[in-house]
Amino acid sequence: MTYLLNSPDDFADEAVRGLVAANPDLLTEVPGGVVRSTETPKGQPALVIGGGSGHYPAFAGWVGPGMGHGAPCGNIFSSPSASEVYSVVRNAENGGGVILGFGNYAGDVLHFGLAAEKLRHEGIDVRIVTVSDDIASNSPENHRDRRGVAGDLPVFKIAGAAIEAGADLDEAERVAWKANDATRSFGLAFEGCTLPGATEPLFHVEKGWMGVGLGIHGEPGVRDNRLGTAAEVADMLFDEVTAEEPPRGENGYDGRVAVILNGLGTVKYEELFVVYGRIAERLAQQGFTVVRPEVGEFVTSLDMAGVSLTMVFLDDELERLWTAPVETPAYRRGAMPAVDRTPRTTTWDAAETTIPEASEGSRECARNIVAVLETFQQVCADNEAELGRIDAVAGDGDHGQGMSFGSRGAAQAARDAVDRNAGARTTLLLAGQAWADAAGGTSGALWGAALTSAGGVFSDTDGADEQAAVDAICAGIDAILRLGGAQPGDKTMVDAAVPFRDALVKAFDTQAGPAITSAARVAREAAEKTADITARRGRARVLGEKSVGTPDPGALSFAMLMKALGEHLTR
């Protein structure tokens, strides 16, 4: 568990602030994350790497010469929001375009993708590289659909070295994908991790057993095995990873490997060295040539007791870049050649939002929106622990926390907007952005998009009637479908949202409140029925069979909020 904290809500932000304070020669804090504290050459591509917090030294610990130019930092185990990614890129990019590098998770794909679209509209060349090294999460044929784990380190290290050596954007992107496709990882755990402020881990592993094939967000493994000796654990890791070794003698590969034995949080270095001793024996027995092995903590999962093995199958190019010098707060190797140490003098910051003039009718509607969002905030707070418990069965256990953070951020943004005399449209637009920023993750992106799209139905110059309220809800659900890409039967929020929308349209006559209340009952029934479905999307997809018997937390939270909305409007 986390022993030292001030507030669970502020833990991630305070950790970043302390990291920057400890490394002022390398890092500068900007809205949404960190960038290098020194100037970078004009026209050099920027490598912006990121993801949720809780994985230190990934990702902010890898910003510096020879590696990353910036890192957006999400909340614990939640992807940074699109606006956070956008802010970090605007501060890091210096005329050479940008590579966005992140692990292949649904929330990161959504938020980084939305930021990339906005940046491209502004004329910045953006490339996306999703790390997908975890062999437990998909088949070899679907390698790029796998999730990213400790392979983040070599992929970003190699891409950063290529940029440092003078690669342009096309070349850096090519090298990053090449490194990703040459990287394989496999992990296991002996106990789950505990979120800051929580008293119980997200999952337990029975004494004498280990969870095999786990992720890095507190997800349980794909199966449980008996815990053997250190040598037996080493053999399992080695056999799983080397099963996907490419043929020697093809494409420049001849048995050279970069090897990373990664502790996930509480496995001590001495234990790791015992395991690595056996791995080194196996490598020698099978004729591998080991290039700059690493043993330590590189991509962690808070205090998870676990270990993972990563191998990068090297050719001449990848070996040269893997062994190149690097200087970051958490990862240093060799002596960097002369680099510009000129302190960064300018930073980009978003201008304050201008509030359009609004009519009294629209401002009255905005005040009602605030009341609804405050109701949402209370419902999410009351159900945070239960939603987290349900999510931990096959996911990372952060859904309750994300919904609580998001609804609180949206309610505060709406109050601030109303205090500035905003109308209904502007209030919902700002609330949607705030929900996405505060929550991060997939649910943050989807609820943020839903509120933003709902706001598009309203006007700042006119009031709103009951029909507009129904139209706004339907627009929000359509945005969830469009952005998330899920369909009914995938075991997501959509399984409750689509039946709700259809029932709402059918039940609505002249009063929105009763129709929403009636449709919310349909949504709840649909959410409960997701317990019978095997998850096909999101982090729970990897543990699909484990999700059977437990309803989808996103579908449940949607039904809860629609019930609260109906009750509020019926009063």
UniProtKB/Swiss-Prot annotation:
Listed under GO biological process in this entry are: carbohydrate catabolic process; carbohydrate utilization; cellular response to carbohydrate stimulus; glycerol catabolic process
Active site (UniProt)? H217
If researchers knock out this gene, what phenotype do they report? Answer: Cells lacking this gene are totally unable to grow on L-threitol.
Q: Which InterPro entries match?
A: DhaK_dom, DhaL_dom, DhaL_dom_sf, Dihydroxyacetone_Kinase
Which SMART domains does the UniProt entry name for this protein? Dak2 (SM01120)
The GO cellular component terms are: cytosol
Domain DhaK residue range list? 7-331
GO MF annotation, one: carbohydrate kinase activity
Under what conditions is it induced?
Answer: Slightly up-regulated during growth on L-threitol relative to growth on glycerol.
Q: Which UniProt keywords apply?
A: ATP-binding, Carbohydrate metabolism, Kinase, Nucleotide-binding, Transferase
- Which pathway does it operate in? Carbohydrate metabolism; L-threitol degradation
Pfam families from the entry?
Dak1, Dak2
Q: Which residues take part in binding ATP?
A: D396, G397, D398, H399, G400, Q401, G402, T442, S443, G484, R539, D552, P553, G554
Q: Which reaction does it catalyse?
A: L-erythrulose + ATP = L-erythrulose 1-phosphate + ADP + H(+)
Question: Which E.C. number(s) belong to this protein?
Answer: 2.7.1.209
Keyword Transmembrane annotated: no
The DhaL domain covers 367-567
PANTHER family named in the record: TRIOKINASE/FMN CYCLASE, TRIOKINASE_FMN CYCLASE
**Described purpose of this protein according to its UniProt entry:** Kinase that has a preference for L-erythrulose, producing L-erythrulose-1P. Involved in the degradation pathway of L-threitol, that allows M.smegmatis to grow on this compound as the sole carbon source. Is also able to phosphorylate D-erythrulose and dihydroxyacetone in vitro.
What name does this protein carry? L-erythrulose 1-kinase
Q: Which organism is it from?
A: Mycolicibacterium smegmatis (strain ATCC 700084 / mc(2)155)
